[in-house]
Amino acid sequence: MRRFFLGAIAISILLVATGIGTTVTLAGSGPLKPGDTLFPLQYFAEQSQGELITTDIGAAKHFISIAGRRAVDLGSIAGTSDELLSIYYLDQALDQAAVAVAKTERTEIEIFRLDLVDLLLQIRDSASKLSVVPIEDPDVYNGLIAKIESLQNLIVNPDSV
């Protein structure tokens, strides 16, 4: 029995050390981007964190922040074969941000207006750098541009809904 406990303790220490080492390595390498092998783990963590937020304002800020990260990712991935995947994750993040903002009180939407404007400017900048998707998948690219314009119209004139 003693041998079992010593083995279990050794395995536990090994797992903790491996976890710490992996965390330090990932933290040192910067945030992951769509197309990276471990990006789905980061995506899962972001989604899980969003589900734990209990206020509508907090959730909206969280998902706007994630959409901002995806917009930056899109710009840094421009010119690679991962553009389409990055657009997919950006599209998902925009949908989540829009739903989260819609759940807030109408009077609280002003809190997010500047963040949303900054987000849309970042997306426009990143989209202008794309070179693969506009040629290989013009419908996807045009859909992204249409979504940006639609969200911009909602920000400029929220009463038009």
Residue spans for each PLM region:
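Long, charged/polar, soluble alpha-helical segments
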Residues: M1-V161
